[in-house]
Each structure stands twice: as structure tokens, then as C-alpha cells.
Amino acid sequence: MNINNSNNNFGEPPPPYSFNNSPLSSSPLGPPTLNNSNTNNNNNNNSTNNNNNNNNNNNNNNSNKQFENMINLKSQNSFQNIKEVKLFNNNIEREMYENLAELYSIIKVTEHLEKAYIRDDVSPKDYTTACSKLIAQFKSSQTLLKDQVSNVGQFMKDYDLNCKAAFDRLVIKGFPSTLEHNTNESSTDSAMAKNVAEAVQLFITTMDSIRLKLVSVDGIYPLLSDLMESLNKNQWLGPTFEGKEKIKNWISILNQMKATDELDDDQSRQLLFDLDNSYNIFYKAIKS
């Protein structure tokens, strides 16, 4: 009781915190004891999470590096195993493949040219020049590939060439479309006289060539093509001129043959007869 009286003049018991020697400091986040423990726990948890994240990142980085190393190793092994594939073994094979590529390109270009002419994207004059050149190149290509390409239709099938217009122009007919249908619009007297003289000269030159036995395909074919073109320039003949049909048939026949082939005696005699008959009809038409 004396103890109580020494600390409390009113004889009341001392408060429960009177025996605390060093009270905890207050904190704006809450009660002192709870706050400190929570803060410490949070700090510990954060440290643990950070350590876990760092460990995960390190593991991911290590996995990525291992994966990259594995890919690089496989790539190096793959490059080491690659072998050069040659399309040809010698110069002869190389030339053959180049000639095949040229034939392929000629057919494709002719197909595009025919479609452009149908759409009126190219003038008749330019079409005739380009088409005649392609036909000549086609004949030369056939000569170079006579042992490899015996059938152009089969060649187009093997290489998936769906070029019907080119096949008709190069293989079946062998002359530009402008030679089938007259596209020349010149009608003056001077131009008419020039066209007549040119046609007469070509008739005579072609017939003389046959009489001299110069009957190889690469020799007769250009003469007949020039004659056909010259007759088309003479509009006054009309589309039913008999001589034009006969010459067109002969051009188609020659187009089926190789450039190095020659007409036999029967073919030469028949061609000469048809030309002579066509020339006589043409000459009579001039006088009439």
C-alpha cells in the first residue's frame, strides 16, 4: 500500500502501462507493435518475391540461351551437310537446257503477243514484225532441239504450258494473223502500184527458187511468207482470192517440217504448179 501511495495521492491502483520501461514509438500507419511486424513481414515477402523473380528471370535467360545455342548448332550442322546440286554435268547439257529455256520463253511470249493483238493493245504493224520474228526464232529453236523435242505439243504438256494461241500460231499456221486478214488501209494509186509490183517480183523469185531445186524449208518458207504478206497489201484482190488460200496451206505444211528438211520431187512440183496457177490468176486480176 505504501507503494501505491508513493505514486498515487488518491489511493488508486496504478495504470497497466506504468511498468513499461520503454514504450514503442508511434507510427502513422497504425499501432506500433502491429505496424512494425507487418512492415517487416511485407519487406521479407517482397525480398522473397524479388529473389524468386530474379531466379525465374535467370532461369528463363539460361533456357533461351540454351535454345539459341541448340538452334545455332543445328544450323551449322545443316549448312555443313548441304551439297551443291548441279543442273548439268558438262557444257553440252548446259547448252541443251539453255535451248529448252529459249523455246519455253518463245512460246510464252507468243501467247502474250496473240492476246495483246486480240485486245488491240498492239498495232497490226508492230504485231506482224514481232510475230514474224518469233516464228523465225521458233523454227531455229526447233532445229537446235530436234533430238530433244520431237513433239512441241508434248513439250508444252510436260512443262505445263497452257498456250493454245501460241501453239496455233507457231505450230499449226506458222504466219502472223495479219496475213490471214488484210489489215492494210493504204488505197492510193501509187501504193497500189507498188504493192502489185512487189507481189509479182515475189511470185517470180519463189518459182525460180523451186526450179533451181532450192527447196529446203528454211529457204522456201521465208519467200512464201513474204509473198503472202505482199498479197494481203493488195486489198483489191478481196478475201476470196484463190492464190492466198493455196499459199497459206503451203506455209502451214512447211511449218510442220524441220528447217533442214527439203521438199521431195512431188511436193516441189505441186508447189510450183500452185504458185504458177496463183500468179496467172493474180495477173488476170490486174488487167481486169
From Swiss-Prot:
Q: Where is this region: Disordered?
A: 1-65
Q: Any idea what this protein is called?
A: Vacuolar protein sorting-associated protein 28
How does it sit in the bilayer? Peripheral membrane protein
Q: Where in the cell is it found?
A: Cytoplasm; Endosome; Late endosome membrane
Cysteines joined through disulfide linkages: none
- Give residue spans, biased composition: Low complexity: 18-64
Annotated source species = Dictyostelium discoideum
Q: Which residues form the VPS28 N-terminal domain?
A: 74-181
